[in-house]
Amino acid sequence: MSSPFKTQSRFLIGSAAAALCTAASAAPLLVTVSVTNLAPTNSISFAPLRLGFNAGTFDAFNIGQTATAPIISVAEGGSGAAWLPAFAAADPTATIGSVDGLLTPGLTRSATFTVDPAVNKFFTFGAMAVPSNDFFIGNDSPTEYRLFNNAGGLAISSINIKANEIWDAGSEVFDPAAAAFVGNNSLRTPQNSVVAFNFAEFFGFNGLTTAAGYVFNSQLTANSDVYRINFSVAAVPEPGTYALLTAGLLSVGWVVRRRREKQPL
């Protein structure tokens, strides 16, 4: 027959362990986003990736419609100067940021973000493809990429983009002299068209020297892989919380041992 102190001790240990598990499951995650340019050598490059982990409420553009100011700030020059604040206004609890740096063919870059998977289940992104006047990659629907499942684990580990998934914002007339990466991007002429898929115009830049120093050669076909986003996660260290809970478990263990020592044989 179990003694009362044993039952109580087991309850205390179980409660402390449950608290430790609860703290771990409720904690935010460190999400590392790695991006790779899969385009052929001397083909297209990409501006920094603008991104957000979110609740699925920020819709920056729609196919067949006039491009919004936020997506134009990504597609024309790549800065995201209007995209980032518009995202924050539409979803104040989102985690928003960038994977910085020009991404030339074959290059990989990464950045790490602290994300609450219970609140921000979706992933939204945008990056200018260059050389171009207004080409970009991004997700049309804000709920297209659900990154986390209900348990807080990764629902997807990567996003792969092909040439035929590159967008034309329809906001600027095609003109190599005014194109980013090969011309003067400030010499813009409005096009007043709509967002559509388009990669064929890249061939119009063949033979031009890019800002990265290579002579451009598109080489793209509809099914050419051009971009990949990889995700990996790790727990966020919380030394104070876990130290306190661990100390509690150790204390319970010490009490159990002391009581056992005092029990008559």
Which stretches of residues belong to each language-model region?
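Structured domain cores in non-transmembrane regions
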Residues: P28-L30, L38-A151
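Extracellular low-complexity, O-glycosylation-prone Ser/Thr/Pro/Gly-rich "stalks"
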Residues: I156-V233
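C-terminal membrane-anchoring or membrane-association module
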Residues: W254-L265
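Short, threonine-centered small-residue motifs that mark membrane-proximal processing/anchoring sites
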Residues: S9, I13, A17-P28, R228-S251
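A general structural signal for short secondary-structure junctions and capping/turn motifs
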Residues: S3, A27, T114-D116, Q219-T221
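N-terminal secretory signal peptides that target proteins for export/translocation
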Residues: M1-T7, Q263-L265
